[in-house]
Amino acid sequence: MHRQLVASIIFILDNFIYRFDHMTEKTNDTKKAVDALWKAYQFTDELAPLMEWIEESISKSTREINTNSASQTEELQEKQEKVLDQIDKKRKTYTESKTKGEKLMTDPKAPKFLQSHIDKLNEMWKQANNEAENRLKQLKGMYVVLRCMSGCQLAITSINHLSLSNASMF
């Protein structure tokens, strides 16, 4: 009887240890998932100011502009060059954020929404650069056209004055 009791206790203890080990494994998996989720949310919180800044940069490069003088266009061109310079200065922050996000994605427990945030960051960064460069090209082209128009207007004015001067001689 004593042996049966010992065998029964050993069986119960083995069973208990097995369940404990199994539960510990699940607990560790859950802890890893929670840690990955926490890091992902922390990353998206850190990403928010950069995303807002990129949106502002895009809006600076896409808002409607009206200019009809070379000097005004030149001022807008200088402002756009500053936007491009600011984008270039933020490149390090963008690269660090992108790298951090990609590193977080290597964790098998990383939440799926993290990839969409990284994709959106990359897409917006590319758009900000493209829009800023396109706007600068447009302004440079517009500046050349306005300078040519200004030169043509001066030539026409000179021709008109000459014509009027010659007409008054007759």
Regions found by a protein language model. Give the residues of each.
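Extended alpha-helical rod segments
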Residues: 1-170
